[in-house]
């Protein structure tokens, strides 16, 4: 059963039984104290969730403490000798608990009542926090266990003041007196025998940490009442009140305690039965130790005193009986991280951790031991599964091209992979083709060499292991190799294997394929392909040692989006979103079924046949768990391939030979229609910076990430982040063949940081692939305002100069101001940008060096007149108002604009409307201003009817004659504001 619902951490089927026993006991106790409650085990929480009964009981305990102190004072007992007297002090100091008797269930008044009770428990009774509960635990039924444990503790404290106690508390006090009597009789030397709270319970007492902590002999905390009420009240006339007036209810068919214990112990299936020796009535010695446990019957439950609390004997045996412990609480041998690769995964991006799967290797459950393979000697047509406790999983036959005949063979995955993977030789004379369904690669490994050669297309070089990491991996591998006892089984997407004896059959690894210590081949018979296909170890509830991180077992009806979280699809969705910004992956994972992806990969392998012939040593890496040294062992092969491709990798940098890379990519585009994935490992830091750039694209490379494709000369689709789901190689031929790599910039060989002139992102943060481009504005649909110098060019919406972006220079430093290739945005704050034109720079320098306003005005006048004269001589007589607001490529302003600025400065801002250079212009829309800005940056504006557009873009003062005479400063033109 899939672990979708919230479950307690304890993995055993009997783990809730002790709570049921406690609930029954507390319900009977409260029903005796408060008959008007009509409480029983079924409506236990419903009767208490208003908090009224709890607050009443708190006041009842306070009254009992008052009576207790009065009795002690009447007998002239010392108030300091008793621990219980010390407990009574804080209770009396607090006063009564206030509550609203008419509170309804679920209301805030009920919450207030419950909160007052919890505060009273904490401050008056000094109950430790681990035994308290929260308001929601009772109101919302979030944690019934804590409510029960807290009420048991309250009952213990009340029993010290002479109140009626539940049966469990009475039995606790009886056991404590029995232990104290034994110690008095035998002396302190006997204490070495101890009780049930010894080392056996130190690691497992979390299953039954229900009450306070006791020592191995006499309780030495708040319950050490050797001279307290239970001895002093022995002479009272009603001692029964201490231990409850109710006799024990017999619901066990009059079986004695010993018979019930014997019945439970007899369920042991060990070769030699788990010993439980009766010492005296209710006292047993457990196992082969000297540990004594105290057993009592509580209605139909056999209870064991554990660590200051109670557990059921069946649950206790589940934890300590070796056969039950192994059957239901399987110990973890080792853990392994399996990166789950999607078919269109670009391996140079590193390991995709968002879909990685953690596999805890442990012994198989009892359910799996039933299905032992009857034949350990497989014929030549099939593999063999031999070894104790191994499931024979039937294997579907495969065709020669690698297509599996079983459509569901890739869906079911074993959760008990081997700690030891044995790859076998593929015999050349066998002629068999081994196909791993659910994975896309084939493994060919020489076991004698022990090296796993990885192809460059799947090697993960972006995560360089440290020497310490390599040492740890070697230690772990040696420890795993030494673990040879017990069955082994491959993971779900395991590598396919063939028999080492040259069998001619075809083996396919499907689901949980098991191999014994001999490790020879693939298990099962081909006849019953679906017989054991969906076997998983969910028959035993999984413990809390991290197994829940495996997620849901894949089945035909349920498919989890992600296997990395415990049970939440929200985690999967959020991680899918986080994948867009993670530094490990830039290609979105494919969510297609495994069998479809396998088919497509096999088609790609058919298309790439000539590559396989040309390079015989192109071994592939399986999708299964890989140890890092095994991958790194093929480093010399990888470096040879990288150097052939023009990529030279050292410890400090990655150098790309552009000429070689271009030749290689052109040859690939011409000879092979399938675009190869990148073989250049990329630094996560560079990717993070690259994605932090606010986006804008310009034409080229089909609108893909030009800063990546132009640098390495690789086809653009290999780098697009929002790549469509990989369907088939043949459908991608057109885009792959038509994409031409853009010539890279010259001085970009040893860096991966995006340059200012290479940034090709979009405004909204997405990358625009070739199919998503907007239709360009051509000459017949858009008339650009020109200055009459060049031929008409097409309008480019996503030019480099039209976005606000965070840019980095070749040293990795952030470029603050607009560079020559990229101006500032129209919408960015002018305060945050440095001036980018020479005139503005000189004006700022002049203003900073001047002492007062007069000097500033003088310097500005001289600068402006100098620039005006220079521009007039350059522009000549033919300069008209057409290019009034144009900025030339050298950043200087045109004469019309200079006249306006000069007049404004000379007149100290008191510029008359008649002196304006143009009639009032309408406010430009965003589209027109963006168009003119883009055209001003691309200095290829053609001749045309640009006079109207040019004159319309000169900004005049915005008020009428009778209004303010000071014009609004125009930051687009001056760039000073």
From Swiss-Prot:
Transmembrane helix listed as a keyword: no
Gene Ontology terms, MF aspect: actin filament binding; microtubule binding
InterPro entries, alphabetized: CH_dom, CH_dom_sf, GAR_dom, GAR_dom_sf
Residues in Calponin-homology (CH) domain copies: 20-159
Tissue expression summary: Expressed in the ovary and the ring canals of the germline cells. In larvae, expressed in the notal region of the wing disk.
Protein known as: GAS2-like protein pickled eggs
Function: Essential for development and viability. Required for ovary development and oogenesis, and is essential for the development of the indirect flight muscles. May act as a negative regulator of the Notch signaling pathway in certain tissues, such as the muscle precursors and ovaries. May function as a linker protein between the actin and microtubule cytoskeletons.
Organism: Drosophila melanogaster (Fruit fly)
Domain of life: Eukaryota
